[in-house]
Amino acid sequence: DFYEYNSCIMEPWDGPASIVFTDGKSIGAILDRNGLRPSRYYETHDDRVIMASEVGTIPIDPANVRSKGRLQPGRLFLVDFEQGRIVPDDEIKSEFAAQRPYGEWIKNQRIDLDDIAAAGQAAGLDEDTLLQRMQAFGFTTETMQFMLLPLVHEKRDPLGSMGNDAALACLSDKPRMIYDYFRQLFAQVTNPAIDSIREEVIMSLECYIGPEKNLLETTEAHARRLRMPHPILANEELHALKGMNYRGWRSKVIDITFPRKEGIAGVRKTLDRICRETAQAIEEGYSLAILSDRAVSDDRVPVSTLMASGTVHHYLVKNALRTQIGLVLETGEARE
């Protein structure tokens, strides 16, 4: 319950990191939840504790070693100078977990996506306008062949190597999505490698959305968040969010399309409107703002959700409003 409560406040730190800390009365270390950084320690008979990334950093007589070990993923190592002992990880966390009724807070306040009942039928695909919509959102033959078809036919994620050596979007003679202008050329390396087994054991796509409270105050209100099993929603799940009126939670759908005839000038005008409508939604007590480009048509074109969400985010931060509402995107752009 303690961990679930704190998950409502802040996402886990993946690292890789090994952090050492002290306040003068105690000294300790903690490892990231994946355990991707080595931290080994010796406790000697002459009351010394030695911790380093590798064994053998300081010469030690093996006969003088009382105990030795390594810091485990997500675990604390603490030496209390006043008590003159090493405090176990379970003892530290049990003390904090027993200070408040975290389980009761979670039960009273947290909302799961499954709790929200959808009314009516979710919007589906219009076969008559499907091709036009795909073109509007930059779908290509390669997108279908290498990304979407493996998902449909083989029920697996498409495989590929990291690093992108395709032609730069700025040199293309075809319209490209704004995301294509930001690519990572090199391959990211982890140490050790992250495999599917480690992913299943440690990693999670679960996330929390909705208004947030003061990080420095431990109150029941922190648990008032909406828990999502994953950040990508099905049409039925999004439809449930759109019509949500549950335990004081409501959502406001904000259209991010504009008339095609307005041209480039319409982009800035629309971004300003989206910011105003989001701020108004906060004043009216909405918990979620859904930025939607579903209204795209021959006469209406969408602002990129990357621009829309980024602009709204920074506008709300600038006006000290960001933590008062959650942002959800309904878009045809999300695929990579």
Where are these regions (language model features)?
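Extended, highly charged accessory segments
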Residues: 7-10, 30-32, 85-279, 283
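Glycine-rich phosphate/ribose-binding loops and adjacent secondary-structure elements
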Residues: 1-18, 24-29, 41, 57, ...
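Extended active-site and interfacial segments that coordinate phosphate-rich ligands
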Residues: 30-76, 86-113
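Residues in well-ordered beta-strands of folded domains
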Residues: 20-22, 50-52, 78, 255
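Conserved structural-core and active-site-/substrate-pathway-adjacent residues in large, well-folded domains
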Residues: 35, 76-77, 293, 312
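Residues on a specific face of well-ordered alpha-helices
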Residues: 49, 75, 180, 307-310
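Short alpha-helical segments and helix-capping/turn motifs at coil-helix boundaries
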Residues: 3-6, 14-16, 34-37, 60-65, ...
